[in-house]
């Protein structure tokens, strides 16, 4: 039963991240459909409410996937570099995956927020254009999904190793 729950959680994390990625790319497509005037490196364009909604939904799903992976994956405590080097391969993989998920979350979330806020109804942008910010944020959501699932699997495996070593 526990393996079925773990499989379901992995599918849930992947589904949220893939959905966030698709929404980020769809937001970029919706943003490109809005009329704009380009002069040299400056660009004036109207905001796209559809791109705003898709970008906001992508941000929410990305954060939910991250929170799900971190809370359900458990807490790994590593006090020092020597402690990390002595730990099992599962724990080392979990720590590396955790670090990468946080880095990717920070970059993807920032890009999605910048693209989403550029499409807020209260803004008519004139300035240096931010091309492909939403689509790059969406692509990073896919990468986040891979590392989040790797973290969840390795963290739960590491926890099982520690509990079975404690009973032996």
Swiss-Prot record:
Residue ranges of coiled coil: none
Q: Where in the cell is it found?
A: Endoplasmic reticulum membrane
What happens when the protein's gene is inactivated? Developmental defects of pistils, some being bent or coiled or twisted, and some showing unfused carpels with exposed ovules. The vcc-3 deal2-1 double mutant shows leaf asymmetry. The vcc-3 deal2-1 deal3-1 triple mutant shows a strong leaf asymmetry.
Instruction: Pull one GO CC term from this UniProt entry.
Output: endoplasmic reticulum membrane
The record gives the membrane topology as:
Multi-pass membrane protein
Which coarse location class applies to the principal site listed for this UniProt protein? endoplasmic reticulum
Q: Which UniProt keywords apply?
A: Developmental protein, Endoplasmic reticulum, Membrane, Signal, Transmembrane, Transmembrane helix
* Residues in the signal sequence: 1-20
Q: In which tissues is it expressed?
A: Mainly expressed in roots, inflorescences and developing leaves, and, at low levels, in mature leaves.
Question: TM segments?
Answer: 56-76, 94-114, 133-153
Q: What does this protein do?
A: Involved, partially redundantly with VCC/DEAL1 and DEAL3, to ensure bilateral symmetry development and early leaf margin patterning, probably via the regulation of auxin and CUC2 distribution.
Name of the protein this chain belongs to: Protein DESIGUAL 2
């Amino acid at each position: 039963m526990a393996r079925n729950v773990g499989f379901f959680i992995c599918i849930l994390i992947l589904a949220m991240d893939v959905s966030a990625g698709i929404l980020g790319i769809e937001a970029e497509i919706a943003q490109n459909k809005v009329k704009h005037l380009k002069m040299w490196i400056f660009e004036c364009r109207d905001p796209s409410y559809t791109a705003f909604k898709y970008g906001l939904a992508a941000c929410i799903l990305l954060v939910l996937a991250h929170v799900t992976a971190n809370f359900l994956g458990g807490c790994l405590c590593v006090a020092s570099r020597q402690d990390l080097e002595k730990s099992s391969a599962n724990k080392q993989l979990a720590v590396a995956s955790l670090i990468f998920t946080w880095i990717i979350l920070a970059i993807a979330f920032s890009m999605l927020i910048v693209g989403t806020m550029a499409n807020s109804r209260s803004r008519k942008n004139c300035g240096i254009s931010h091309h492909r910010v939403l689509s790059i944020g969406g692509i990073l959501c896919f990468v986040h999904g891979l590392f989040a699932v790797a973290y969840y699997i390795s963290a739960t495996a590491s926890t099982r190793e520690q509990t079975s070593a404690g009973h032996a």
